[in-house]
């Protein structure tokens, strides 16, 4: 029999070419024996968990692949008996393999989104634990001294602070996580379930992200105190939309600075006016109201 093997795309640009391949297989081959030699044939950074389905993307599941093929249904039946014409690798990015295996072994396909969120939460907790441990071994910190002072002045508190990671709580109880790598800084909020929601992404990494963070902390600080919102500063940075992403950009000293926001233009428009200000200016704007 001829069996078409396909898989989901795993990243942007991965869908520019077809992943399909067609194999000639003796019909008396059992499903278990056939699948034992199959892989998605793609390298994925981090957790790479797949649900293996008969037919297409919406076909019946028969097992999973996480570096090891696990056939959990119909393993002893032949391809001819099952009428197999296709195998699809359904990509479950971030899903913990052990939880997926536990559910499938019990005969249940779990909700994909819920399992992925659990995987991300576990990963974020590991990141937080590592940052806490790192902070105990070094005096280097992600946020500038000015941003640390702003957090305190605006009713917040820093709970974990390491060289590339900071978790803090604002005056209204909202938890924020700020991270940085060699290319970008990222600011996220964390909900009660432990899920992160991206607030903005910034380049170059460093103080640029602090402008949005401190402006957000300032706005919530005033709201908790029953104060009127401040008038945004006159330093305007143009907001535009490209490729489904709302952003602002400006060039300073020959270096392009950029802030990206999701899911719409509301956040980009709200925080663009602060992008060219220094953190102490933003703090003063919200606490004193005299920075222009």
Describe the function of each predicted region.
Residues 49-70, 218-243:
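An exposed acidic His-Trp-rich patch
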Residues 197-227:
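Long, charged/polar, surface-exposed segments that mediate recognition or autoinhibition
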Residues 20-24, 194-205, 257-260:
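A short, exposed loop/beta-hairpin motif centered on an aromatic-Gly-Thr core
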Residues 129-177:
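N-terminal "first-domain core" detector
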Residues 1, 171-198:
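Short aromatic-glycine-(Arg/Gly/Cys) micro-motifs in beta-strand/loop hairpins
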Residues 27-29:
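Short gly/acidic/polar-rich coil/turn motifs that serve as flexible hinges in modular proteins
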Residues 78-83, 90-96, 101-124, 128, ...:
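Intrinsically disordered, low-complexity, charge-dense segments enriched in Lys/Arg
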């Amino acid at each position: 029999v001829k069996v078409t093997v396909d898989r989901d795309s795993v990243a942007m640009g991965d869908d520019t070419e077809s992943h399909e391949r067609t194999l000639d297989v003796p019909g008396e081959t059992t499903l278990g024996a056939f699948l034992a030699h199959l892989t998605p044939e793609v390298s994925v950074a981090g957790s790479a968990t797949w649900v293996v389905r008969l037919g297409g993307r919406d076909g019946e599941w028969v097992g999973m692949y996480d570096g090891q093929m696990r056939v959990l249904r119909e393993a002893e039946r032949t391809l001819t008996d099952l009428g197999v014409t296709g195998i699809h690798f359904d990509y479950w990015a971030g899903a913990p393999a052990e939880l997926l295996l536990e559910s499938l072994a019990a005969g249940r396909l779990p909700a994909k989104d819920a399992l992925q969120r659990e995987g991300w939460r576990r990963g974020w907790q590991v990141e937080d634990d590592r940052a806490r441990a790192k902070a105990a071994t070094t005096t280097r910190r992600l946020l500038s001294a000015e941003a640390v002072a702003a957090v305190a002045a605006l009713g917040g508190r820093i709970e974990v602070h390491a060289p590339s990671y900071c978790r803090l709580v604002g005056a209204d109880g909202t938890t924020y996580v700020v991270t940085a790598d060699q290319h970008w800084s990222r600011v996220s909020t964390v909900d009660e379930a432990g899920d992160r929601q991206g607030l903005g992404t910034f380049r170059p990494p460093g103080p640029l992200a602090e402008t949005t963070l401190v402006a957000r902390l300032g706005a919530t600080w005033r709201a908790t105190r029953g104060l009127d919102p401040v008038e945004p500063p006159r330093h305007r940075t143009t907001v535009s939309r490209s490729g489904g992403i709302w952003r602002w950009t400006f060039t300073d000293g020959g270096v392009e600075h950029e802030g990206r926001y999701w899911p719409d233009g509301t956040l980009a428009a709200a925080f663009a006016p602060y992008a060219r200000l220094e953190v102490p200016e933003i703090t003063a704007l919200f606490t004193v109201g005299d920075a222009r």
